[in-house]
């Protein structure tokens, strides 16, 4: 789950980090009111969970409440990388002396947390890595040991702060807060870009990003509720799949994919790519899928406007072919049939019974996965 900037900054504030005054608005009138309350110049930030908002016109500075109102009327409804602007974060404009970069991620290769710090901020860390890799410091933290003072000192020194000054203490507290957020909220990313030193001498995060592991959302009901109220970059189909309990990822192709097991599903996607097609999704119904799970999974793709063909690749170990066929039958019955072509390759437990059930629906069963994938791609092109 990707948090909006205002949500991420609320977390930072909760952990004692100073942030500029600001609130989120859903109408131009609210934007004007917040700007009046803040006083002076304000920054309007479109709340969409994608990078590059500024280049797309999603970040503007307003000197007066009226200017903020006018800018907001244009900003609401903007499409930024496929996401529509429905919220604007209005925050006090801050003059800065310098900008830095600081993030915390999970390094899966070493199974440790990894801080990335650079005295250069406000630009993509990937760009810094390409042009000035020597400017990036990597500090690994073993989760079994936790964050220690020597970790913090190493990071803060690299960012250019003098020991035991007020700025040193502020920067140190930000490092500690980011680590605590990472651990407490099961995050995959905690980032401030830029982390800034203001004209007043404060160290504050001008921007903040937090991504929480979707598999840990059950531990954070307030975030689950926020995601339900505002799906952000999660499609309606992904939200539905999450509620039903199977794994679904939205892609940009037109061949719908259903498999049982992550490995088989990814291999099925590879086959579609191999024959020149483009998968519309990743959908894993898991092992031992019941009739109802298959039914709900198929309904997602039957309703998806971009899906032209549905390719089901099922290996029946603990998953029974007749249960899968029954799920297909139930989905078509509930949806009143479909004009979309369904291609099925199914092997294993109760395979013959499943074949007979699908034959009654006019759906042929393919023996070979390559042949089935090729047929699915051909039908999508037709």
From Swiss-Prot:
It comes from the Archaea. Pathway: Carbohydrate metabolism; tricarboxylic acid cycle; succinate from succinyl-CoA (ligase route): step 1/1. GO terms for cellular component: succinate-CoA ligase complex. GO terms for biological process: succinyl-CoA metabolic process; tricarboxylic acid cycle. Mg(2+) binds at residues 193, 207. Residues 9-240 form the ATP-grasp domain. Its cofactor is Mg(2+). Binds 1 Mg(2+) ion per subunit. One of its GO terms (molecular function) is magnesium ion binding. It catalyses: succinate + ATP + CoA = succinyl-CoA + ADP + phosphate; GTP + succinate + CoA = succinyl-CoA + GDP + phosphate. InterPro entries: ATP-grasp (IPR011761), ATP-grasp_succ-CoA_synth-type (IPR013650), ATP_grasp_subdomain_1 (IPR013815), Succ-CoA_synthase_bsu_CS (IPR017866), SUCC_ACL_C (IPR005811), Succ_CoA_ligase-like_bsu (IPR005809), Succinyl-CoA_synth-like (IPR016102). Belongs to the succinate/malate CoA ligase beta subunit family. NCBIfam families: PRK00696.1, sucCoAbeta. Heterotetramer of two alpha and two beta subunits. This is Succinate--CoA ligase [ADP-forming] subunit beta.
């Amino acid at each position: 789950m990707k948090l909006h900037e205002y949500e991420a900054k609320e977390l930072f504030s909760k952990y004692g980090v100073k942030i500029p005054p600001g609130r989120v608005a859903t109408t131009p009138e609210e934007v004007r009111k917040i700007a009046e309350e803040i006083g002076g110049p304000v920054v309007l930030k479109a709340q969409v969970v994608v990078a590059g908002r500024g280049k797309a016109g999603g970040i503007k500075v307003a000197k007066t409440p009226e200017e903020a109102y006018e800018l907001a009327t244009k900003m609401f409804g903007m499409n930024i990388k496929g996401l529509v602007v429905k919220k604007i974060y209005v925050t006090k404009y801050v003059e800065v002396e310098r900008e830095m970069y600081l993030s915390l991620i999970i390094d899966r290769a070493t199974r440790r947390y990894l801080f990335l710090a650079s005295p250069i901020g406000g630009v993509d860390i990937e760009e810094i890595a390409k042009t000035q890799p020597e400017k990036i410091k990597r500090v690994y933290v073993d989760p079994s040991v936790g964050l220690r003072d020597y970790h913090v000192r190493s990071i803060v020194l690299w960012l250019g702060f003098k020991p035991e000054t007020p700025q040193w203490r502020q920067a140190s507290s930000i490092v500690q807060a980011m680590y605590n957020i990472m651990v407490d909220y099961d995050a995959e990313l905690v980032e401030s870009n830029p982390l800034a030193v203001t004209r007043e001498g404060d160290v504050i995060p001008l921007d903040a990003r937090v991504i929480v592991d979707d598999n840990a959302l059950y531990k954070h009901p307030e975030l689950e509720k926020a995601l339900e109220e505002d799906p952000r970059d999660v499609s309606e189909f992904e939200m539905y799949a999450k509620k039903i309990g199977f794994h679904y990822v939205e892609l940009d192709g037109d061949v719908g994919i259903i498999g049982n097991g992550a490995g088989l599903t990814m291999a099925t996607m590879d086959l579609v790519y191999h024959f020149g097609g483009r998968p519309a999704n990743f959908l894993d119904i898991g092992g031992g899928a019941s009739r109802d799970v298959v039914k709900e999974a198929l309904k997602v793709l039957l309703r998806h406007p971009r899906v032209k063909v549905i390719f089901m690749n099922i290996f029946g170990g603990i998953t029974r072919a007749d249960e899968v066929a029954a799920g297909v039958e139930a989905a078509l019955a509930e949806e009143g049939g479909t004009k979309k072509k369904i291609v099925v390759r199914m092997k294993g437990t109760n395979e013959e019974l499943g074949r007979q059930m699908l034959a009654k629906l006019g759906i042929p069963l393919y023996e070979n996965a390559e042949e089935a994938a090729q047929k699915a791609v051909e039908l999508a092109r037709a």
